[in-house]
Amino acid sequence: LSTLLLMSLLGFGVLSTITGCETNPVTGKQQLSLVSSAQELSVGQQQYKPSQQSQGGAYTIDPSLNQYVDNIGQTLAKLSGQPNLPYEFIVLNNDVPNAWALPGGKIAINRGLLILLEDEAQLAAVLGHEVVHAAARHGASQMSQGMLLQLGTQVLDQASGNSAYSQIAGIGASAIQARYGRSQELEADHYGINYMVEAGYNPHAAVELQQTFLRLSRDSSQGNWLNNLFASHPPSAERVQKNKARAALLPKGKRNTEAYQKATKQIRIDSSAYETHEKAITEAKKKSWANALT
């Protein structure tokens, strides 16, 4: 690349950083944002239903479970840096132990994760973490970085005429938009614990949650779907240790184990049937029809 082009790219990056920064509503720090709040809300609203449908759809067998999860989520959301976002919380009929947040406060948690949790405090740890991603505009920040990379791709294409540059930059854009960074995950852990403690929950539940995710990430028998899961929420020993240190400084709170076990009773009753179904699907994909039918 020519020196002039490199200087132009550098200048654009600096200019974008200056004009595209905003104050993080949760931390009070400056962060990149080329996406307006209105655009962010629109993206979340437009993608919420399609995202649900592509991941098993809403869990409708026990409507009271959705209400239970939403009540806890809304309580935590009111304590966030953006309490007036149009938050929604839904349970998805999906075996993968995952939860996610779209821009604008559109949050989902899978049936497969609810099965692994032991009490309401652990559920609050999950939902508090996702609320931070939404309130801190992490999704908007990811989209902004993707926009800069896409612009860089276009500039490189025009300057070089070489599609290889486009492919490399395109992969980078996809990777950034599909994965929260280390700082964003630590931020969501830290402030998520704040929210759950303010709501009266035991912060050690957040430690237990990360220990569970770390154990799953190290279990090679679980297959590639776990690699895809942890691409968006990468667990680490660092996160476990930071959560431990933070929880040790905070007051103990409620666990609400009995209430949680009661709320999740139906999915626990049905868990063996779901496991059988998933095994059958796996065998069918291998065209092992006899195994799929047993």
Task: Go through the PLM ranges and name each one.
Residues S2-T294:
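A Zn2+-metalloprotease active-site environment signal
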